[in-house]
Amino acid sequence: NVFIVTARINGKTSDKNGIGIFEIDAKNCDIRSYNTIDGYRCSEVAFNYVNGKLLCSDEKAYECILETIYAGALAVSSEAIGIMQKCFDLTIDYLKTRTQFGKTIGSFQALQHRMVDLMIEIEQAKSSVMLAAGTYSSEKHIKYKNISAAKNLVGRVGKLVAEECIQLHGGIGMTWEY
């Protein structure tokens, strides 16, 4: 197993040149794994006096880093769309089954309007991600602009969807059981 890491090998902090991408053997690193509060696992990796194989440097390394960052931003934005859609679907199901005053709460017009507003926001974010994915093979400035716009919109809409879905679920929306 190996790690691919970046490091400054010379030059100033803001300089595109002087960056190197290295392959580091994982056996030479100190790895500490631990559980997080939400039940997931994380690891902390320490690179103490390790030797690495230089894969590329300077302008080439900078371009590789940019490409990786933008590919990751597009992937995370795509994943977030799926998460938003799942939250929306769970909330729709909840509104169809939860009763209050002898009626399902999904029949209340105010809640229907809120869900329609969420659907519009999710569809807009989804379209933005699809545009970014569709222009991935375009010139870099077009690709980077579209991915940045999608990531920005998805971040704002994701926060809105999470807040609204929790609100619409009421107290049960804050529990691990649900």
Roles of regions detected by a PLM:
Residues 58, 67-178:
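Alpha-helical interface subdomain recognition
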Residues 4, 23, 46, 75-76, ...:
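Conserved beta-strand segments that form the floor/walls of ligand-binding pockets within enzyme
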Residues 25-56:
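Flexible, small-/acidic-enriched active-site or ligand-binding loops
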Residues 5, 22, 45, 84, ...:
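Residue-level signal for inorganic ion chemistry
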Residues 11-16, 35-39, 67-68:
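Solvent-exposed alpha-helices and their adjacent loops that cap or buttress functional pockets
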Residues 10-18, 53-60, 137-143:
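Short, glycine- and charge-enriched coil/turn segments that flank and shape catalytic ligand pockets
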